[in-house]
Amino acid sequence: MKFLLDNCFAPRVAQAIVALRGDAVVHQHDKFARDASDEAIVQALAREGGWTILSGDLNLARQRHQRRALRAYKITVFSLAPGWLDLPLWEQAAKLVRRWPEIERAADTAEAGTMVEIPVSPAAPFRRLAR
């Protein structure tokens, strides 16, 4: 399982997880051109297989056509709930690192193409988003 952290995350947050987890985690800037479209990124990840996207883009969860495309390409997405990106960088990184084992377990068991929301509260369970 490989994880791509999208541009909503500071590259330093991805680097912190890489330092702890290893090369199974990549920031979007390290894999794709800055002007790469979401569609091109999803298609490339689908061709390679085995990718899960971690996104702070709330539109992914809200726009039905994007959810359909991700499901069609069998890309699982973990989307941050509203409020995550309002946190200071250190707190955002700490919460993400704290939940990382849970994210990996959920990614291992999620049906390909599923969208899952990660709440800000560490006590709250992950929530599968509507298809």
Kindly give the residue locations of the regions a language model identified.
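Charged phosphate-binding loop/patch that engages nucleotide di/tri-phosphates or the phosphate backbone
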Residues: E102-R131
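Catalytic phosphate/metal-binding cores of nucleic-acid and nucleotide-processing enzymes, i.e., regions
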Residues: A24-V25, E48, F78
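Mid-chain, well-packed structural core segment of small domains
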Residues: L60-L96
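Ribonuclease/tRNase effector modules and their secretory precursors
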Residues: K2, A19, K95, S121, ...
